[in-house]
Every structure is written in structure tokens, then in C-alpha cells.
């Protein structure tokens, strides 16, 4: 069955825009990827579809300031704000990476008012897999 989307047109420019209903998302998953240079926070619904995302670079931090905990906190606040506006109340948190911003981003999420069900560290650790690259000589 085809779902009809109401059309909005303006007589001045003749363009037709489509209006989609915003979905309410009560539960979600917050992914924090904290690399050594940047922190990326992605908010998804339970099925894995992206609701919002933010990074320290997209929050306006450039260069070496992107790796700071304050930049990670700002990125987490920006990503969570959109999710809260769409009705998110509960979330699981998956943290990946060795970066400086992992704790600061988690603190910002805790202060946002979203109830956290689960906090997991999903940093990939090799069980003696591939040989690492040679040591850097400066």
C-alpha cells in the first residue's frame, strides 16, 4: 500500500516540497568513537538508522584542539540535543577507541537527562592478529 505524503507548493516560485512526519524515537544507541585526533558521536535508533551525529571538527574545533575533552563534550552535547528533540528518553552507549574525549563525552551524555541502560566498551583488540607496522623513527 502506498503511503501518501502531503505536498506543499508556493505560487511564487512553483516549487513543490514534500513534508515528512518526524518520527518519535523513545530508545536509541549512542556511539562514541574517540580517536587520538577527533571524537565522533553518532546517535542511532535501535535498528541502526542514524538520527543525528556530531564531531569535534563539526562543532568548530580545528587542529590540535579537536582532541581535547572539551571538544568531545561539545560534540556529544550537539548530537544529543537533536535526539532529545525527537523524543529520545533511553539509550545504550557504545564507546570505541583510545582517545582523550571518551570520558568527557560520556559525562556530557549523563548530564543530558537521557536514561542510560547500558555502557559498553567495544574497542577492537587483536588476539595476536596482523603484524603491526614498524616503529616510527624520528
Swiss-Prot record:
Molecular function in Gene Ontology: rRNA binding; structural constituent of ribosome
Localization (cell): Plastid
Ribosomal protein keyword on record: yes
Cross-referenced Pfam families: Ribosomal_S11
The keyword rRNA-binding is annotated on this UniProt entry: yes
InterPro entries, A to Z: Ribosomal_uS11, Ribosomal_uS11_bac-type, Ribosomal_uS11_CS, Ribosomal_uS11_sf
Single GO cellular component term: plastid
GO BP term (any one): translation
Record-annotated membrane-spanning stretches: none
Family recorded in the similarity comment: Belongs to the universal ribosomal protein uS11 family.
Assembly with partners or alone: Part of the 30S ribosomal subunit.
Protein's name in the database: Small ribosomal subunit protein uS11c
Source organism (scientific name): Cuscuta obtusiflora (Peruvian dodder)
Gene symbol of the encoding locus: rps11
Amino acid at each position: 500500500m502506498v503511503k501518501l505524503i502531503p505536498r506543499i507548493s508556493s505560487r511564487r516560485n512553483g516549487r513543490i516540497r514534500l513534508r515528512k512526519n518526524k518520527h518519535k524515537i523513545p530508545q536509541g544507541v549512542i556511539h562514541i568513537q574517540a580517536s587520538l585526533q577527533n571524537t565522533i558521536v553518532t546517535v542511532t535508533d535501535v535498528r541502526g538508522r542514524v538520527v543525528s551525529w556530531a564531531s569535534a571538527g563539526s562543532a568548530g574545533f580545528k587542529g590540535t584542539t579537536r582532541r581535547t575533552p572539551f571538544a568531545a563534550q561539545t560534540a556529544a552535547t550537539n548530537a544529543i540535543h537533536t535526539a532529545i528533540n525527537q523524543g529520545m528518553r533511553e539509550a545504550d552507549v557504545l564507546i570505541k577507541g583510545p582517545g582523550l574525549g571518551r570520558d568527557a563525552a560520556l559525562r556530557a551524555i549523563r548530564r543530558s537527562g537521557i536514561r542510560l541502560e547500558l555502557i559498553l566498551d567495544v574497542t577492537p583488540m587483536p588476539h595476536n592478529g596482523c603484524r603491526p607496522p614498524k616503529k616510527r623513527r624520528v
